[in-house]
Structures are given as C-alpha cells and as structure tokens.
Amino acid sequence: MRKSVDELSARLGVTFSDQRLLEQALTHSSFLNEHVEERMHLDSNERLEFLGDAIINFLAARLVFERFPDAGEGELTAWRTALIRTETLAGFAQRYNLGAYVLLARGEESSGARQRQALLADTFEAVIAALFLDQGLNAVRTFLLPLFEAELASLPDRTLPVDYKSRLQARIQAERRVTPRYHEIDRSGPEHRPEFTVEVRAGEERLGTGKGPSKQAAEQAAARAALDALEGGTDGR
C-alpha cells in the first residue's frame, strides 16, 4: 500500500510549493503503463531521474573537490563514486522509506520492486530533481550535504574507496588508445534481489567479467578481474 505524499514531505523535512513535482518524482513508468488514463494528470519520473543524477553528481564532485584539496583526479573520482553509486543512493532513499511512497504497477509491486536498489536510487534522484525545480540548488545542497558527510564518515578509517573502472580505463587508454566498454551479459535471481553479470572489453578482446547486486557493482568487479588478469597474465574470468 502506498503511503501519502504529505507524510513523505514531513519525513523529508521539506514543504514543496508545487507538490505535483513530488508526485511526479514518485510515479514509476510502470504505473502509467498500467493506468493509461492517469497520463492526463501525471508524468513518469524518468526525466526527473535524469536531472537529479546530474545534480547529485555535481554536488558530490564539488564536495570532494573542496574537502580534499590535495587529492588528484583519480582520488577525487573515487570519493565521488562512493557518494553517487547505486548502493549509496538506495541507502539514502531507505532513510526516508521512499519505496513506500512510489506509484507502481501491480506486477512491479508483487515482485518486491519497492525494495529494489535500482528503483530506490532512481526515485531518490527524481526527488532531488523535484526539490531543485521547486526550491533551487541551495535547498538541494542543504538537504544532501548531511547525507554525503555521513557517508564519507562511514567509510572504514576514511579509507579511499578503490575505483577499479577508473584504474582500468587509465591503463587501457595509455597502453592501447581505446576505452574499455562494459556489457551486461546476464541477469539472474528474483526481481527484488537481482545478480548482474557484466563483461568488459577493449575492442574485440574480453578483459574480464564480474558479478554484483547492481550493474555498477558488477562493472567494478569486472574491471577488478581485468586488472588482476593484466597484472598476472591470466584470463580475467
């Protein structure tokens, strides 16, 4: 059962001037596919996801740029990745129980979509975009900064997260003048707990494969396998 938008506004600590933006942020495309008549009044949150993704990326980049003045580009990229990855954004969404407020089709509902990390992360991005359109960038920054700060503080001993994708890209571009490409080759498990399998290639050569609970995690695992193979002279499977 979906909970009320007014309740979510109170949970977020935000009063929207245009509550329709928040309604849109919580409208999954599957709901409109099932309830065609609602398209007269509602849009899906896909466009808001696009905008929210860009806003979150920018604010995360700005924070780590200011926080770590001596860090190089690779380190800054790794810190930013820790803040914007699917698992992190899904965790932010869970703090506010966002999944309980999303409009979903019955099929998505029965498959456990409200707990799916990808859906939670996408919804969080859409809510951020709605807040930006309603109140501007400063309001978004005020809302996001404590979440980002808590995430950075939670990293073990402030250890820099390893971004294997960035490491692999730098190496392959330097050695072969091409950019590694990632391809999803399998998805298994239940809808609410999927496992992705991804391979990474340089041109036609497969460098490695990896598995994970999200495409991002699987890509990182594939990049790590590729680096291990390149350094050890083995197949990256």
Curated annotation (Swiss-Prot):
Keyword Phosphoprotein tagged: no
Gene3D superfamilies: 3.30.160.20, Ribonuclease III domain
Residues of the DRBM domain: 163-232
Top EC class for this record: hydrolase
Listed Basic and acidic residues bias regions: 185-208
GO biological process: mRNA processing; regulation of gene expression; rRNA processing; tRNA processing
SMART domains noted in UniProt: DSRM, RIBOc
Domain RNase III: 5-136
Source domain of life: Bacteria
GO MF annotations in UniProt: double-stranded RNA binding; metal ion binding; ribonuclease III activity; rRNA binding
Amino acids binding Mg(2+): 49, 122, 125
Cofactor section: Mg(2+)
Catalytic activity reported: Endonucleolytic cleavage to 5'-phosphomonoester
Region described as Disordered: spans on this chain: 185-237
Active site positions, chain numbering: 53, 125
Family: Belongs to the ribonuclease III family.
Protein name per UniProt: Ribonuclease 3
Annotated source species: Roseiflexus sp. (strain RS-1)
Phylogenetic placement of the source organism: Bacteria, Bacillati, Chloroflexota, Chloroflexia, Chloroflexales
